[in-house]
Regions:
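Nucleotide-activated sugar donor-binding and catalytic core shared by glycosyltransferases
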Residues: 1-49, 53-55, 59-177
Length: 177
């Protein structure tokens, strides 16, 4: 199945930023959440590109509870997996606090800025596909500026993408006739 989410949102490849934020340490902390939203607002203003933010229900609830404005961001409902994967694969940069998204962007060759102070995916830092920016608005903006020069030439630490084919070959070769 092919997704046309870019067409539906009127987006061009590499001409938007994608954001996810759902971790309690970010969304339940008013200071951190405000810092993240301020950083994203600064990114949108400086680059004049859409900042697509599919808002996790937890994050949406906190934004409303805390009375924090949208700051010019394109807040959307969460997307299905195929739509989100399409958005990830064509983004200029993904800003996230999700461990899984850090892995996905690394495999897809898309730069990632992690809005946390540490990560359980250090291999993404080691290969250069990801940087840690925390929840500081200035660091978020500086990270986006720095990724303008990134080239997706890092080595994928998660394998070569042909594990399924290898498994089928082994199963077929060992199957009784």
């Amino acid at each position: 199945k092919k997704s046309d989410i870019l067409g539906e949102l009127d987006l061009e490849p590499r001409e938007y930023f994608l954001v996810t934020a759902h971790r309690p340490e970010n969304v339940d902390n008013r200071t951190r959440l405000k810092g993240i939203l301020k950083g994203l607002e600064r990114v949108q203003k400086e680059f004049s590109l859409p900042v697509i933010f599919p808002v996790h229900p937890r994050t949406e609830k906190r934004i409303k509870e805390l009375g924090i404005g949208e700051n010019g961001l394109n807040l959307t409902k969460p997307f299905g997996f195929l739509e989100f994967l399409q958005l990830e694969s064509q983004a200029r940069l993904v800003l996230t606090d999700s461990g899984g998204v850090q892995e996905e962007t690394c495999v897809l060759g898309v730069p990632c800025a992690t809005m946390r102070y540490d990560t359980e995916r250090p291999e993404t830092l080691d290969v250069g596909s990801n940087i840690l920016v925390g929840a500081d608005s200035q660091k978020i903006l500086e990270a986006v500026r720095s990724t303008e020069s990134w080239k997706p030439d890092w080595k994928n630490p998660y394998g070569d993408g042909i594990a399924g084919k290898m498994i089928i070959m082994v199963c077929a070769a060992t199957r009784p006739q």
